[in-house]
Each structure stands twice: as C-alpha cells, then as structure tokens.
Amino acid sequence: MENRFGNKIIYQLAPRTFTPQGTLKAAQKLLPHLKETGFDVVYLTPIFLADDDTDRSFWSARLKKSGAENPKNPYRMKDYYEIDEEYGTKEDLKAFVAAAHSLGLSVLLDLVYFHCGPKAAFLEEHPDFVRRNEAGGFALGEWGYPVLNFDNPALREYLWKNMEYFVLEFGVDGYRCDVGQLVPDDFWVEGIRRIRRINPDILMLNEGYVVDLTAGESENGVFDANYNFSWCNRLIEAMDGRADAEALRAQWFKDRDYYRGLTGKCARMIDSHDLATDLPTRNELAWGSRGVECALVINHTIDGVPFVFNGYEVASTCAACMFASRLSKGENAIEWSNLLLPEGKYRLAWMKRLNELHHRQEPIWKGSLRFPETTRERELFAFVREYEGKRLLTVANVSAQPVCAEVSIESAGMKELLAAGAAYRQEGPALCLTIGPKGYLVLAD
C-alpha cells in the first residue's frame, strides 16, 4: 500500500510556543510562513479543554518539576469536544483549518485517549468511563491521571463520535494519537475506518509502535506513520557524542527488523514537545547550528517521514516547555526576532532548501537504502537511496573531529544538492572527502 504521507513533511505546532499570544488566531497568521518554508502537514498539539483541577495529587511529576504552576496540562483532557479558551474558539479552529487548506496544508489534531483529567466533563454522567481501583477511586496511569475504560462500549462510541466530529464539522485531515499503543488496537481499527468513510485521505500518525496496525502490514493496518523513539534517541546520542555512526547503522537495521521493513513509515524527529520539556538543554544550544543541520539532513534523506518541531526553521533556542503559557510562569515563545539576525535568516533559507530537496528527490521517499563502505565507519554515517536508476548519497560526519575518508561509490556525474564543511573528489572507485565536525554532503544523479 502506498504511504499516504508520500513526500510530506510534518511540522509540529505547539500553540503555547508558536506565538507570544498562544492562540489559533495568532498561529493562523503564520501559516503562509509554514507553506513558504516547505512544510505540508501542520500537527497541532492539543487545543481541547484541559482540566484545571488544582489538586496536585493529579499532577504528573513532569508538571510539578517544570515550575510552571499551571494545572492545565494540554495532555490532561477535561472535554474532548470543546476548544480551550486559552487557544480560542471553535470558530477560530474552523478558520485555522480553512486557511491551512487554502494554502494546500493539511491539519492534524492530537487525540489523547489513554487518560483524562479528574474533572473530565463526562464523569458525572458516566463514572464508568474510567477505570476504578478496589476502593472505587480512579485507577491512575503512568502519568498520574485517570485511565479511560475501553471495556465500556459506550466510551468507545463516545470517542469514535469525537473522531468523526472534528472531521465532519471542522474538516481536519487526520490525527496524531497520543501513546497510541496504550489504547486497544481494535478501537483504532474501527475509529479510523469510520473517519475514512468520511474522508478516504485521512492521515493517521501513531505516537507508538504497533507494527500490526501500520498501513501495508495487515488488513488492520490503519496508521500511516509511527513514532520511532529508538531512532530519535540514538540520533540525539550521536549528536551529543554519546554514540557513533556504527551505532546509528545498527539502530537502523534493528528498526528494519522490528518494523518488518516498514521503516519508511517512521516519523523522523530530533525534537518534540516532550523532548523540549524534558531535556536539560535545547538541541540548538547543545549541538550548535551545524549539529542541528547535520541531524536534520540525515532525517530528511533517510527513509521515513520528516518531523520538525516548531522553531527549528528560525534556529529558536526558547525553552518550549509544554506546561508553560502566557497565563502561567515560564512563558517561552519562539524568538521570531531571529529572522532579523544572520543565523535566523540563514536557517530559514537553508530549511527551505532542505524541504525542497526532500520533495523533489524521489529516491528519498520511494527508493531503497543501502550503506556503502567507508574508511571511517565510526565517524561517517553514509547511505545511498536509489529509485529507478537515480541515486542520492548522504554523508554525515557525526563526530566532533574532522575526518579524511573514502566512500565506496562512483560519484561521477552526481551533483551537489547540499553541503557544509565538505571537500571531495572522485578517485577511481571511491569518493575521497575531507569533512569537518558535524559536516554533511548530499549528492544526487
């Protein structure tokens, strides 16, 4: 089955971080910027009514640690059918989706169906919509929130109607499913089949790794892409200097086996609302501009669906904590003023080139992948994508040292598409190159 994401690039938009106002109206004004930069799918973190319960016994450890002192965790739902006034109104969401569609952008909303807030709107009428402990209280999940009871057919119907509602009434193009592997498989199969009867082109992104539910794997294959935490973590380790290129290759082969060859349906990321909240230092500060660009080049040219967290296109270093907002402590909006500075101007132009490269080069999203031999296997992460006789070569030095090496490939006739810190020439059957720390080279026929 063809991948519905095709050559699309996902942009994760967290409203609290995306603009100082933190609203859908403010975000809508910047949609032309996303289109011009070359993004295709706008994934909105939850904008539904969040639980404002101040009982800290129902606050996650992460929320307490953040210091935001904000009970409204966007991933702790109070009402799945209402828009939180922090972000705007239902009319604002309709206008946002319509504006996105006018630009050719798709919009995904975030479904948080594993748990809910302790004051969820349905609890008074349907106390059996959540699991209970032996004492009759809430059964709490990993993050300390009441866990939904999928043994209850009425809950399933309530949530299936919720999925249909935002497709029918707002025209959204699909969903990202929070911790999707913790929700029963058969719930997703039925729910996604229902919304695809409304719109056959619905896009579904699973924040999980249920291989049997991946499109193309079985008759129950309903998710078009999965998160791949193992790859994300290994690439971060490589950029941090805690892993090398050999570890990256080993991880790719491990993932290929686990995903049964469907690694092309893995979201490729180096950051997200979770990572930005939890990691001690933003990648832009930890790796520098060259390191970030090296990692993005790898993820945009290897098999999979590129996934970019908001702000990377302007080299933002803001804290981006998901719990902080203009209404709480720790406001942290993207520094759009970077676009007045050389580093921001450069990154935006560079991101446009990278996104265009991904869109235009069919070997990236249709082709096979192999790893050519190099004389510096620990430092160089090199791979070839090939489709219908056309090749694309990516070489990235993931080490902190300059490297002189050979890559076993005949590169005569290949053109340079993107490069930084790399000098190269063809000598016989090998590409000889000198490449600086976190340098990269992309060539194509």
Model-flagged regions — what are they?
Residues E416-L431:
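Solvent-exposed beta-strand/loop surfaces of large extracellular or lumenal domains
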Residues D52, R56, R260-A412, G436:
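Loop/helix patches that line or flank the sugar-binding groove of alpha-linked glycan CAZymes
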Residues A27-D40, V97-H101, F253-Y259, A295-I302:
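Short amphipathic alpha-helices and their capping/turn segments at secondary-structure boundaries
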Residues I9-Y11, V42-L44, V107-L109, Y175, ...:
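Hydrophobic faces of well-ordered beta-strands that scaffold small-molecule active sites
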Residues Y43-D52, D110-K119, D178-P184, E207-V211, ...:
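Short, solvent-exposed turn/loop segments enriched in Gly/Ser/Thr/Pro and often Arg
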Residues E2-G22, L31-D40, P46-F170, E190-N199, ...:
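Substrate-binding/active-site clefts of carbohydrate-active enzymes
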Residues L168, D178-G261, C266, A315-R353, ...:
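Active-site-proximal helices and loops of the catalytic beta/alpha 8
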Residues E427-D445:
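C-terminal beta-strand-rich structural cap/linker in extracellular carbohydrate-active enzymes
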